[in-house]
Amino acid sequence: MKNSLLLYAEDETNGEASTCGRILIFLSWVLVVLTMPFSLLVCFKVVQEYERAVIFRLGRLMQGGAKGPGIFFILPCIDAYARVDLRTRTYDVPPQEVLTKDSVTVSVDAVVYYRVSNATVSIANVENAHHSTRLLAQTTLRNTMGTRHLHEILSERMTISGSMQLSLDEATEAWGIKVERVEIKDVRLPVQLQRAMAAEAEAAREARAKVIAAEGEQKASRALREASEVIGDSPAALQLRYLQTLNTISAEKNSTIVFPLPIDILTYFMKSKEAFVPNA
């Protein structure tokens, strides 16, 4: 019984509001007719190709959704409208101090590209869609970075940007906002951490250089051993190497006089050494 009385009271209130609204609309039309043609300057409005107009009549959204682009008509005194820009906007997220998952404090900033996808919803569902989106972008940046390790933040920016874009787009859909893109601009580390990372990188480079030098010396010693074996097995190769050495020494501009030993004597000494080693 009580619910029936409440429903009856609501219907009666709506009926009275509807009757009052019809009277005000009629009076507004009378005002337009009486003030012709000056009223036309007030009644006709123009919105651009990239804009839409959300019209309220007596505080209620008009049927048919947002108007535009082009000319639309409003009644004076009872109609109000809001222009909504549909173009893509950019928002530079200010640097946010974030504590990463491995307890490192970093400063991160980003840029967000977004636009209004539903003009009516962006006006009716939220007081200031742009301001709300910007605040949400800051909190989303902090929350996303707080779940990542430092090496992930430095090496997986594209993945993190995509994750932020999906989170923002899902949250702002109820506001009539479409988040098109999110980009991580810069990740600033503490000075002490930068120095430690630079020292670590320098030590790693020095270690790699030492390994490469050791491998080079090993290959060179192996090549020298193989060359000495070839020269020892071939007297002609020994003589050719001897002549190359004499040619190199004589080509240098110095005052040193070199008296080369005959190759036969060198061969004799080498054979004597080979004969001495087995006897030992």
UniProtKB/Swiss-Prot annotation:
Q: Show the GO cellular component annotation of the record.
A: plasma membrane
InterPro entries named among the record's database cross-references: Band-7_stomatin-like, Band_7, Band_7/SPFH_dom_sf, Band_7/stomatin-like_CS, Stomatin_HflK_fam
Q: Which domain of life is it from?
A: Eukaryota
**Keyword check for Transmembrane helix:** yes
Residue intervals passing through the bilayer = 23-43
The cross-references to CDD domains, in alphabetical order and at most eight, read: SPFH_stomatin
Membrane topology per the entry is:
Single-pass membrane protein
Membrane as a keyword? yes
Instruction: Name where it's found.
Output: Membrane
Among Gene3D superfamilies, the record links this protein to: 6.10.250.2090, Band 7 domain
SMART domains per UniProt = PHB
Describe the family membership recorded for this protein in Swiss-Prot or TrEMBL. Answer: Belongs to the band 7/mec-2 family.
Tell me what this protein is called.
Answer: Band 7 protein AGAP004871
Give the species: Anopheles gambiae
